[in-house]
Amino acid sequence: MFSSPESERPLAAVGALSRSRGVEHRGQTCLAGRVQGVEQKRDGSDATAILRVAEAEIGRDLRQQVQALLQACFPGYPSRSYFKLPPHFRYLAMTSGVLVAQMGVELRVIRVGSTVVRTFGVVDLCVRTSERSHGLAGRLLAEVTELARSCGVDFVILFADDGRLYTRGGWARAANPCSWVKIHDHTTLGLATAEDTGSLMVKRIGQQAWPIGEVDLLGHLF
Ligand SMILES: CC(C)(COP(=O)(O)OP(=O)(O)OC[C@H]1O[C@@H](n2cnc3c(N)ncnc32)[C@H](O)[C@@H]1OP(=O)(O)O)[C@@H](O)C(=O)NCCC(=O)NCCS
């Protein structure tokens, strides 16, 4: 299995966006620059807005909410808003100005065997306990899938021990050998390899079949 240290925790995440709507969200000035959002009706009178936000444009207040949600959802999560390195963008689900779900997404070119493929890697998908089992995570995964299609991304990949949510969304286990860069607390430790991570899941977006061969993540584990 994993030759990486305990600190190398496989995580999953997701996101996506469809219709573009402006930058303002309940007057939150912490969201500077390009933000896209989709209003989502909930059972009651309230609505959850799903936003796609570039990581660099997330302001301090919202970043603190992200960190608090991650620490609440993942026991032992470090005291920052990302596990290894910040993702490129996130999907944020906001209800009444409060962050209720989030998913990080990284644009990563990886090599599988001799084939170089363009992927979105999903990390740290999580939903506030009180909001679970209402399809929110599934919705974020559907959004990132839609974005991947519109961006010509070949695959959306993630690492998950529990595959239920993802199998339902069209992901499948992939048993390729895998290698990645071990990073712990901003220090590069070396290279990790696994014959089969047991947790890699892949969703095909385009016409290309998932290749045979070793997966070289060309970076850290998602
Ligand atoms: C996993 C999680 C994001 C699901 O969010 P959600 O909004 O409740 O998801 P959905 O409503 O779209 O789907 C719920 C289904 O996901 C599946 N599921 C539950 N926990 C899961 C988990 N940890 N991993 C994968 N699938 C899970 C179940 O089949 C569940 O169905 P149920 O509600 O009938 O039991 C949420 O439970 C969570 O934040 N867990 C803690 C963090 C975590 O484990 N994230 C996943 C990292 S890979």
List where the protein language model places each region:
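Conserved acetyl-CoA-binding loop-helix of GNAT-fold acetyltransferases
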Residues: 127, 133-146
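Conserved N-terminal entry element of GNAT/NAT acetyltransferase domains
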Residues: 2-4, 11-14, 26-60, 218-221
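Conserved active-site alpha-helix within GNAT-family acetyltransferase domains
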Residues: 150-154, 160-186
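C-terminal "cap" of GNAT-fold acetyltransferases
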Residues: 181-222
